[in-house]
Amino acid sequence: MKLWFPYFLAIVFLHALGLALLFMANNASFYAAASMAYMLGAKHAFDADHIACIDNTIRKLTQQGKNAYGVGFYFSMGHSSVVILMTIISAFAIAWAKEHTPMLEEIGGVVGTLVSGLFLLIIGLLNAIILIDLLKIFKKSHSNESLSRQQNEEIERLLTSRGLLNRFFKPLFNFVSKSWHIYPVGFLFGLGFDTASEIALLALSSSAIKVSVVGMLSLPILFAAGMSLFDTLDGAFMLKAYDWAFKTPLRKIYYNISITALSVFIALFIGLIELFQVISEKLHLKFENRLLSTLQSLEFTDLGYYLVGLFVIAFLGSFFLWKIKFSKLES
């Protein structure tokens, strides 16, 4: 527990700082934007790129006998650094540009949401293909009660292929030998396309409500707080799961199927909701169907709570399913 303490202390500080800046802004209409910023940060912890990067780095450092406790935290700090810097720059730039382009706020908000939604759908579909391949291997190993060397190599190839940015920056992992070395990798991940669209949303929110500089700073800080909390918890869970999951090949593939399935679901679910909400709003669509009307009015704050609860249930369900149905294959 002592090894985790400095990281969780830093996370508590980020939460306190973000909330303090938010309350100092003294603008109740800004609370929704702050909730959205926190949820967007938390959402990233469940992105396929984040999961794959943290997973691969922890696996590498653990196999080398090195301390991997700070991987999730330093990765999120690298990613958040881009968001903090660019949100501040973008907010000031947008405030200036809005005087010359009155439609910028509306157009930018729509474009940002569309880009984010489409990107999530693409990532979700790419990882769904990988998930199908993992399930095929698991089915074969389930029937044969073992994994061949070729199947193990195929699993490794699939796991390192999860996430678009993870594929692109894969060579950088060779230079990571300590937890803090993942910070620049996280920074590069922060330059990704989906992050750019979210920066635009945060900047537009602060500019639209005409909040003070203090309030504007609360958005990227809360974004960083949400991301660092769940990325660090992700790393903690993976370190614990590593001891359990990688003792046998079957556990390894089952664990990664569970993780990949969750990342596919969240990418497709949030992407579809983002696109559905912006399209229905612009077309002024009204739905009598209860489900569609609920999705249309669903707040991202509520969505964040639902997703966190869903992940807890899914992880527990996955663990007990293994114990009940598949653990006998290890004997």
UniProtKB/Swiss-Prot annotation:
GO MF, one annotated term: nickel cation transmembrane transporter activity
UniProt main location, coarse: membrane
Topology in the lipid bilayer: Multi-pass membrane protein
Keyword list, A-Z: Cell inner membrane, Cell membrane, Membrane, Nickel, Transmembrane, Transmembrane helix, Transport
Superkingdom classification of source: Bacteria
Keyword Nucleotidyltransferase: no
Keyword Transmembrane (UniProt): yes
Transmembrane segments: 3-23, 77-97, 110-130, 184-204, 213-233, 259-279, 302-322
An example Gene Ontology CC term for this record: plasma membrane
Cellular compartment(s): Cell inner membrane
Task performed by this protein: High-affinity nickel intake protein. Imports nickel ions in an energy-dependent fashion. Necessary for the expression of catalytically active urease.
NCBIfam families assigned to the protein according to its UniProt record, in alphabetical order: nico (TIGR00802)
Family: Belongs to the NiCoT transporter (TC 2.A.52) family.
Record-given protein name: High-affinity nickel-transport protein NixA
Organism (species): Helicobacter pylori (strain J99 / ATCC 700824)
Gene name of this polypeptide: nixA
